[in-house]
Amino acid sequence: MSNQRKRSNDEREEEDDEDAEGIGEWERAYVDDRSWEELQEDESGLLRPIDNSAIYHAQYRRRLRMLSAAAAGTRIQKGLIRYLYIVIDFSRAAAEMDFRPSRMAIMAKHVEAFIREFFDQNPLSQIGLVSIKNGVAHTLTDLGGSPETHIKALMGKLEALGDSSLQNALELVHEHLNQVPSYGHREVLILYSALCTCDPGDIMETIQKCKKSKLRCSVIGLSAEMFICKHLCQETGGLYSVAVDEVHLKDLLLEHAPPPPAIAEFAIANLIKMGFPQRAAEGSMAICSCHKEVKIGAGYMCPRCKARVCDLPTECTICGLTLVSSPHLARSYHHLFPIAPFDEVPALSSLNDNRRKLGKSCFGCQQSLIGAGNKPVPCVTCRKCKHYFCLDCDIYIHESLHNCPGCESIHRPKSVSLMEE
């Protein structure tokens, strides 16, 4: 009997081992739940759940400090008019499931978020999409300023097939970007899944061609570091990085949303002719010059040739005039004069006196900065006006508002000050 029990126990252990080997690493994470990884020890030795908002804010501030350090010292001229092609590797390597549920799904998800963020920060810029399948590069969308058009085209072509060809992708985007105006900054962002590239010719010649045409090529890898990708970025002045997980991939993508420093040849001041079209009347009917279709209502009319276009910003296909709106120029202005990062306030009891002088609440949203047990809540302070802000307002000010409410409240009209005197 004892021998039979031992045999049955051994058989059960072997079955458990086989079941564990049959599931993937990411599936095992769901099975085991790993709930202990979501706990952390506080200053009193007690276990409590991890504060995801604090982690997000720490990541945000690291990115902010990095951008601020790059712009420290002399003021750097930024390329506000950008022409960016996003190249997405949809070869068979994109079907790998080390990123759950697959590399292809994760790339599509974060490229969608990146497109929206890109147009929010760069309203005067344009994006185009290129995919790589079966060793061939395909143009999903031409350069344009409509995020919905790009996202719709991307989500309709999700399929991982064949090998990847980096050279074919570079040749295609070089052909497209070689036609953009000289004042625009030509950029390529490649999301590469494969560990090799199957090219029809010498890719080194293609890289030199991109370098001569002033294409700034950046690569984000999803597998491992490749020499050819690193060489491409070094030659063209781009950035090369490899994502280790989904969160890291998102951070790497968002680093490309703010405009990069302008190339010295393009930093020379010159005038750019632009048109500010009027929105067409709701009931009017006209042929759209960009889609070659009859459309009723929505659209804009070129002030020079009276052609109809759908979205702004864009270039008139009839007369070649750059068409923008005044809010686009206003939203691009903050990149030239970015607001300095706020200083973090350490949570010490000695700071309570200073907080009482300037108030116990956030200057932005009026939320209390004194938590339970009369403990100070983590906050930041502006270097100029010395007002305190909560973490949420800190993110909102630097990502959306681009002005410090405390500093803006100090400046008063001269007429008011003269009346008081």
Swiss-Prot record:
Residue stretches making up the VWFA domain: 83-272
Gene Ontology molecular-function annotations: zinc ion binding
Superkingdom as given in the UniProt entry: Eukaryota
Keywords in alphabetical order: DNA damage, DNA repair, Metal-binding, Nucleus, Transcription, Transcription regulation, Zinc, Zinc-finger
Subcellular location: Nucleus
Cellular compartments per GO CC: transcription factor TFIIH core complex; transcription factor TFIIH holo complex
Acidic residues bias spans: 11-24
Main location as per UniProt: nucleus
Quaternary state and interactors: Component of the 7-subunit TFIIH core complex composed of XPB, XPD, TFB1/GTF2H1, GTF2H2/P44, TFB4/GTF2H3, TFB2/GTF2H4 and TFB5/GTF2H5, which is active in NER. The core complex associates with the 3-subunit CDK-activating kinase (CAK) module composed of CYCH1/cyclin H1, CDKD and MAT1/At4g30820 to form the 10-subunit holoenzyme (holo-TFIIH) active in transcription. Interacts with XPD.
Known function: Component of the general transcription and DNA repair factor IIH (TFIIH) core complex, which is involved in general and transcription-coupled nucleotide excision repair (NER) of damaged DNA and, when complexed to CAK, in RNA transcription by RNA polymerase II. In NER, TFIIH acts by opening DNA around the lesion to allow the excision of the damaged oligonucleotide and its replacement by a new DNA fragment. In transcription, TFIIH has an essential role in transcription initiation.
Protein name: General transcription factor IIH subunit 2
